[in-house]
Amino acid sequence: MAFPYVRDNRLEITCGEAPYIVSRYDTTTGAAIPIEQRIGILDRKLRIVSENTETSGEWLEWAQEAYKSTYAYEWQGDNLLIARETMLVTFIEYYQQKFGKRPLLKSINYIAYIISWNVWQMDGLKGVVPNSCGERRTLVYELFGTKEDVSQCEGCAKDDIRRHNGTYCLIKDWRAKDPKTGKMGKRIRFIDLIK
């Protein structure tokens, strides 16, 4: 199958419940949207996969490619959970529509694994896990006692995304080999993608 769009990397920033990735329901009314009328980024990719594959194995291979190239981040954990759940249910719905049955649990679990790497919680202005950076306190032991040394986050003070002392978010580049494991799916810091 030669459909480069399925493998094109796409990112939804501050994704909320990910309505631009998957459009399972109308966000204003809550009404379900039939699969044929869905217009999200991943919906379009899965529609292309469904229209151009015959076997379950071929469909799963290309659906995995579609998920591996679709990314999103969100600051709020509750929205992140809904976004991930919506993407997972979308996988099941498209598979059921194509083959008339649910996918195997191992297939569902693998898509969930991909989603867990590709849809993550992040403060988009800092590139770190929300609320993970700030002042750091360390005890300094001296000859006549101890004192507390307080240092501020340099990234916050200088508005420099590369100098935060918080936990930087990791994602996977599914097409690059991880030097530690030798397997495809290299772990990278999201901010390292920013030029």
Q: Where is each model-derived feature located?
A:
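Conserved S-adenosyl-L-methionine
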Residues: 1-127
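Intrinsic-disorder/low-complexity loop/linker signature
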Residues: 30, 43-46, 134, 166, ...
